[in-house]
Amino acid sequence: MSHHHHHHQASLVVAYLLLIFLGFFGVHRFYVGRTISGVVYLLTGGIFGIGYIVDFFLLPSLVCHYNNKHHDHTTVIVSPTPVVYQSGSQHYAPYQPQPYYAQQPIQPQQQQYYQQPYQQQQYQPQPYQPNSPQYQP
């Protein structure tokens, strides 16, 4: 036996129709998933008519809250191949950054060290190029 609950997308028009015609019985509250307050309305005649009037103003937020709670608006796309972006006639592959290989910083020679103060040089990383001679066996 399956216990899946299939929640409907609540409609504001339907909720107002239920409020107008059956609001004193709390049917509109049951419709938007407010079971406890629906029972209270059922037993008290819409809390003696006051809750019936207040719900004319609260109903849009009740419907919105119900829909946000029971319906996820996220779409997930699972693709076994890389996604290719298309703009007109040009195709773009997703950006894939190239790895950088760290190199030892250049140290001054011993004689330079004593003759002048050491000036640190900026390290400028170079992109990995697999066909470069320095990476060939």
Swiss-Prot record:
Annotated membrane topology: Multi-pass membrane protein
Presence of keyword Membrane: yes
Domain called TM2: residue spans: 9-57
Top-rank taxon: Eukaryota
Keyword Membrane recorded: yes
Main location: membrane
Region entry Disordered, spans: 106-137
InterPro entries to which the protein is assigned, alphabetical: TM2, TM2D1-3-like
Stated family: Belongs to the TM2 family.
Protein's recorded name: TM2 domain-containing protein DDB_G0287015
Species of origin: Dictyostelium discoideum
